[in-house]
Every structure is written in C-alpha cells, then in structure tokens.
Amino acid sequence: MLQTDALTLARQIRTKEISPVAVVDAVLRRIEDLQRAVNAFITVTADEAREAARRAEAAVKAGERLGPFHGVPFSVKDLLFTKGVRTTMGSRIFADQVPVEDAVPVRRLREAGAILVGKTTTPEFGHKPLTDSPLFGVTRNPWDLSRTAGGSSGGAAAAVATGQGPLALGTDGGGSIRIPAACCGIVGLKPTPGRVPHIHQADPFSSTSYIGPMARSVAEASACFDVIAGFDPGDPYSRPEPVDDPRGVEVRGLRLGWLPRVGNRLVDACVLGSCEAAVRHLEGRGARVETVEEDFAPFEQTFLVFLQAGLAARVGPYMPTFGDKVARSLRESIERGARWSAADWANALAQRTTVYRRVRALFERFDFLLSPTLARPPLAVDHDPYEPITIGSESAGSIRGAWYPYLWPFNLSGHPAVSLPCGWSSDGLPIGLQIVGPWYGDRRVLALAGHLERERPCARPMPL
C-alpha cells in the first residue's frame, strides 16, 4: 500500500478495494517508523488524519460524490499555512503559530478529498538548500543517511520517497523543490508565477518563491497540479487557466536547448552522463538538440539580494530576542542582507528583468531547455552552506554557483521547471534532470517529463 501511487490509491478507494482508514493508518505507521532515522516531519496530525479518514470511508459507503484524491494522504511543507495546524516556518520564532486559514493549494487538496497527515521539515524560513534547524534537528537522505535530503523542501521529498504519503506540497524560492526532488529521486515542479496561488507571501510582487507539487511520478505530480492550479484574486500574478497549455507533447520536431553548464566549471561525470543520455534519447525520437552556452553566474548576487535582504526585512526584527535560538547560517544571511542598500535592491530588480529577457530570448529558439538539476549528487548532511563544495576532488565554488546554478535563474525569470529522476550515481544516489518551459507551459513541461519517465524508467525499490 505504501508503494502504491496516489492515482491508484484514489481509484481503489472509490471502488472500495481498500479503505482510506487503512491507507492513513499505514502512512502514519510509516512516519512513526522512519521519523528517528529520516526526520521528515515537524508536526504529525495523526488524530485529525484518522478522523478525516473515517469521514472519507463513510462518504464512500454512502455513495457521495468524491473528489479526485478522496482519502489519499498528503503532507505540507511547514512554510505553508494550514488551518488549525501549527506552522513554524522551521523556526523557534514561530514554534507555536497556528494559522486560521489554509494556503490556497492546501485548501484545494482538502476539497479534492486528500487527507493531511502532517507538516514536513524545512530549514528556518527556507533559507538554505539543506534541511536542518535548531527546532527539529537534521533531515537525512533516505538513500544514504550521511547525505542531505536537499532543501529547503527536504522533509517533503524524503517523505514522498519513503512512502510517508504519496503527495507533498513544497515551496521553491531558488530551487527548493527541485533540489530535494533530485536528491531523493522524486519529481518536483516549480510552476509559472501565479499558476498555483501563493497568497500569504509578505511581498508577492518581488518574490522568487513558488508553491508546487512533489510526488514519486510525473503522473501524480501532474494530477496534483491540476487540483492546486487556478485563479485566486489574492495572488497578483494569478490568472484564469490558459487554454494553450496542452497535456501532451509530440517529441518529433521539438527544438531542445541543452545546457550542460550555465557558468559553472565542473559537473560530476555520472550526472553529466545520465542527463546527456536522456537528452540523446529525445534526439533519437526526432527532437532537434542544440547545446547552449549560457552564463548565469554574474546574476548570483542578484539572487542573493532577494534572498538575504528579504530575510533581513522579515526576520531581522526578531533577532534581538531570538538571535541565539536560530541557526548560524540564518543569522549570517540576515546580517548580510542588512548590508544591502536600497540601490542594491533596485539594481537587483533591474537585473532580474535582464535574466527574464535572456531566458525569454532562448524560448524564441527552443521549445524546452534541459539541464542537470544539480551539478553533483547530494552533499554531506552537515555541509556548511557558506563553504565551497567539491566535485570529484576539486573545489568547485559556492553552493549556489557550483551545486545548483541551473535552478535559481528560473526563479528570477519565473519560467516553469520540473526535476525528474534520470539515473543513479556510482554510489547509488539519485540524479535529476531539469526541464524548463515558457511561461504558462507548465503542463507541457510535465508532458515531456512524463514521456521521458515512461520511455526511460529508472525507479528503484523504495529506500528503507
């Protein structure tokens, strides 16, 4: 049951082959069994989930109209509001915060019949690409407990990868869905701005953060996206669902831009080989592939201005009281953010526009862009995010510029991007491929990912 996908679970619940009570009980036992080793959850809503499962079972027996995910368990990253369930932002600052309303995609999943089993771990305020916090400890990669699950949606990815619920909601402010998806061997989508409404952001107009689905397969992620996407007036970028975002894609004739590097010098050989094999597979199916030389490295500072200045503005005021109760990496990010000037912020806004225009120009030549998700397999679980990373035996540079340089540029530009598994490293760790599409091409991105997943399956038995 734990390895059954969300769509099959929903069908089996509708046809009374299995009970939502049994499904939820199995997931809650799995969470309890793995919490000490993996540590994917901050809060487990066991009582509420069991009560919801009983109501779901009664609805099935009564012949009521059922939603597409009726009785299916899901989890939510602890940066997203959940009505009546504490939302800590991964920090002691908000350890007792209980929202009075759901985030829009949380509400939509509940309305679709899905059952919340808990809130997953995140570094404080999602400030780094590894998942640990003084509030809850360290979240580990289920494929190798000495490695990171990635971040900042690390708990969500680790939970999905190990059967602690087939669906999760994550957030992606600079790769925070795609990094852990690649680290844990699952699928994660960063949507176009506004496709999945994000109404509780402090500054939606300059945000780089997006809410997206995480699942073990593209089909599940796509079905989840169908539920959570759609207009909401609380998000200024939200709009009615586009009519020109088809659910299928014909590979023959596609124009694909392949970006093996984007200003980074080093790429792990296993990563490069696995991703190139996926690209060449598409070429063999009739796609036209061109290697693109694009350098996003000069825009790393632009990304840091948004990240660090935002933290300084929103979290900095709490430092006199909580400064000794938060992670050193968060304090350092806030201190750096406080040093950026208003002119730096204005320049960052202009540079963000430059990134958007450069990426948009690429889509005049290509239908999709493809790249590795990460330049190397998962880092050590205790890696210092302010220290350089190594690839092979060489020092490769900063964690953003050397490990995930392929990701944050599309947070700046807003283009939809999905990470899906495409291979395994020599030491048995997942490797992710990123597919990027034009604005509002989210379903086309998922369609191409689904094509690769069907034709080049690389799933392995569930870890742990």
Regions found by a protein language model. Name each.
Residues 101-228, 411-423, 427-432:
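Short glycine/serine-rich loop segments
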Residues 190-273, 277, 455-464:
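A short helix-breaking turn/cap at a secondary-structure junction
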Residues 16, 27, 71, 111, ...:
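Glycine-rich, small-residue loops and helix-cap segments
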Residues 1-50, 284-286, 461-464:
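An N-terminal boundary/leader segment
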Residues 20-25, 54, 269-293, 315-321, ...:
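Acyltransferase
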Residues 27, 49, 221, 256, ...:
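Residue-level signal for inorganic ion chemistry
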Residues 49, 59-135:
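Acidic/His- and Gly-rich active-site-bordering loop/insert found
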Residues 69-89, 248-260, 306-360, 373-377, ...:
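Short helix-loop capping/hinge segments that flank enzyme active sites or metal/cofactor-binding pockets
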